[in-house]
UniProtKB/Swiss-Prot annotation:
Gene name per UniProt: Amph
Known function: May participate in mechanisms of regulated exocytosis in synapses and certain endocrine cell types. May control the properties of the membrane associated cytoskeleton.
Membrane protein topology class: Peripheral membrane protein
Lineage: Eukaryota, Metazoa, Chordata, Craniata, Vertebrata
Pfam family, one: BAR
Subunit structure and binding partners: Heterodimer with BIN1. Binds SH3GLB1. Interacts with REPS1 and SGIP1. Binds AP2A2. Interacts with AP2B1. Interacts with DNM1 and SYNJ1.
Modified sites of kind Phosphothreonine: T260, T280
GO cellular component: axon terminus; cytoskeleton; extrinsic component of synaptic vesicle membrane; glutamatergic synapse; leading edge membrane; photoreceptor ribbon synapse; plasma membrane; postsynaptic endocytic zone
Record-annotated SH3 domain positions: 610-683
Biased composition (Low complexity): 424-443, 468-477, 585-596
GO BP of this protein: learning; positive regulation of endocytosis; synaptic vesicle endocytosis
UniProt entry tagged with the keyword Disulfide bond: no
Name used for this protein in its record: Amphiphysin
Amino acid sequence: MADIKTGIFAKNVQKRLNRAQEKVLQKLGKADETKDEQFEEYVQNFKRQEAEGTRLQRELRGYLAAIKGMQEASMKLTESLHEVYEPDWYGREDVKMVGEKCDVLWEDFHQKLVDGSLLTLDTYLGQFPDIKNRIAKRSRKLVDYDSARHHLEALQSSKRKDESRISKAEEEFQKAQKVFEEFNVDLQEELPSLWSRRVGFYVNTFKNVSSLEAKFHKEIAVLCHKLYEVMTKLGDQHADKAFSIQGAPSDSGPLRIAKTPSPPEEASPLPSPTASPNHTLAPASPAPVRPRSPSQTRKGPPVPPLPKVTPTKELQQENIINFFEDNFVPEINVTTPSQNEVLEVKKEETLLDLDFDPFKPDVTPAGSAAATHSPMSQTLPWDLWTTSTDLVQPASGGSFNDFTQPQDTSLFTMQTDQNMAETEQALPTEPQAEEPPTTAAAPTAGLDLGLEMEEPKEEAAIPPGTDAGETVGTEGSTGEEAEAEKAALPAGEGESPEGAKIDVESTELASSESPQAAELEAGAPQEKVIPSVVIEPASNHEGEEHQETTTGTETREATEDVAPQGPAGEKQELATEPTPLDSQAATPAPAGAVDASLSAGDAAQELPPGFLYKVETLHDFEAANSDELTLQRGDVVLVVPSDSEADQDAGWLVGVKESDWLQYRDLATYKGLFPENFTRHLE
């Protein structure tokens, strides 16, 4: 028995070795291989048919699983409906019956699909493994057939022929050929038949699935219609308890856009080619001022502004005002720009919103109000200041011209490069405010203070962004020129006593190194004069006169500060426009200056009820609603209190155009809303 098993095992091993050897020879090309291309095509079709059947079986199983899931979901849905259904409601038993029948239909549909389609598909795919094994066995028998054939050919072609071995090889060859032919013939007939039967199988399978699904949907539609009728009758019995979906809340009316419109951006004005290098042109129209923040409106020392572009190319320490010292006196120096370079003074909201209350005098005369300075007076350079049309106070031009120009040269004459260089060399660097008073006056020893701009409170009104050469230049006049100026004033004019007093005070202030520090330390109860300055910004547009409007309230407040100084108590303003050095004689005031000032004061009294202040329009604004004003650039609007706090908080103001008020005197008809950031304050 053991010998038999050993013989079978050895025989199988020998077959495997022969097959391996034959395959190696065929791969190396040393032995030919029997090929049947027709059969190979049958094999490829068989593999494709098997893959398609396997996928169809997988998808059908997934479909049946989904049907089972739908059955469970439908059953749970009907159970939940039966639980919430009240006993006294119509159709309680019908709802229960519909749920039970739906579950039966789902179960029947699933079972018929399993029996009619899935089992048939499993039977169809069950024949593929056997055929696949027979194809593999035929391949092995083909190798045995080729091996026996090659062995027989080798013996027959040998020189020394052994008949016994040749006859034995012939028997093995015939045996291998017979076995191979049996497998080959069966597969040659079976594979094409299997490939052709696939069409009928697909037809029967999907016809069965579609018919079962159509029957199921038809039967379950009857149950769904029955349930729909029950729910309809239940709703008719409880019509007063109908459920309605509430929509969005109704609109109460048009809402105003809370955000105020943004003003249009204007291009920077073109520089003038004839501008003097020691002058700075003001912008044609300042940028709109945004609403102040609470931190900017409270009293106290000014908040230091954020870093900004200075008029000069190089940022120097002398160009920055030190707001954190005890005296709050700005120190300003000049950096002369290059030839044919015009620097534009940009209006920053941080400087406009600064509160200059700390610069007011400590001692104010009784019955006089503090002079208010307009924002423009804090931002424009001194060389753009012009004389007020109300009253003209003569001034000495020598205090401005002695420092940088000869006596026979006007201030506005074009300077040469040589004069510019001399100016830079002649300008000393002033120390910071925290240095002792003796060191602060050392670079300017022997220089006197001028009439127009040497008052410490006027220096506070000069913006840090403007050229400060004017404050240094005013120290060039001597005490003798101040005495000559006092003598030149007319004796019969009401301004003479006041002017003389101002000159005496200027001379006394010049004798001390730090005028304001000495005043604060001594605590002398002497009265200070804060002249009101009217400024006319330069315009880059031809034919356009963009002039600062001086309001009546500002005129009255400014003149009340000056009135106690003179014997006649006249209202007057100091002229800050410099005059040439050779015109030392005083210029008398115009005949109608006092009348113009008085008429402005009378017009200020005829203002709308609740008048707050005036604003000037910087940009055109077209009204979008009937309660808004249509404004053009340059219009003056009289601001009155707003009826709605929401509009005021959103940046809207209420007012009436000054032209409409002067013409109609009807506030209720002509007032309207307008954006605050399109305007600037005039008072």
